[in-house]
From Swiss-Prot:
Family: Belongs to the G protein gamma family.
Biological process per Gene Ontology, one example term: G protein-coupled receptor signaling pathway
PROSITE patterns in the record: G_PROTEIN_GAMMA (PS50058)
Name of a matching Pfam family: G-gamma
InterPro entries from the UniProt entry: G-protein_gamma-like_dom, GGL_sf, GNG13, Gprotein-gamma
Protein name per Swiss-Prot or TrEMBL: Guanine nucleotide-binding protein G(I)/G(S)/G(O) subunit gamma-13
GO CC annotations on file: dendrite; heterotrimeric G-protein complex; plasma membrane; synapse
Assembly description: G proteins are composed of 3 units, alpha, beta and gamma.
Length: 67
């Protein structure tokens, strides 16, 4: 391990204290919530619902041609 000076050690301690205080949630709880949020947004999301892309005037309709 390399030699650290006092300011580096203080920064490391502050970072570790911050990480320790951070509230974590179980993945078994958050992953189903995330999947439900994604599934609820499918009707409104043009990236997940291709029918919405048909009404978007900014989507390219054909391939690019070089003049």
């Amino acid at each position: 391990m390399e030699e650290w000076d006092v300011p580096q050690m203080k920064k490391e301690v502050e970072s570790l204290k911050y990480q320790l205080a951070f509230q974590r949630e179980m993945a078994s709880k958050t992953i189903p919530e995330l999947l439900k949020w994604i599934e609820d947004g499918i009707p409104k999301d043009p990236f997940l619902n291709p029918d919405l892309m048909k009404n978007n005037p900014w989507v390219e309709k054909g391939k690019c041609t070089i003049l």
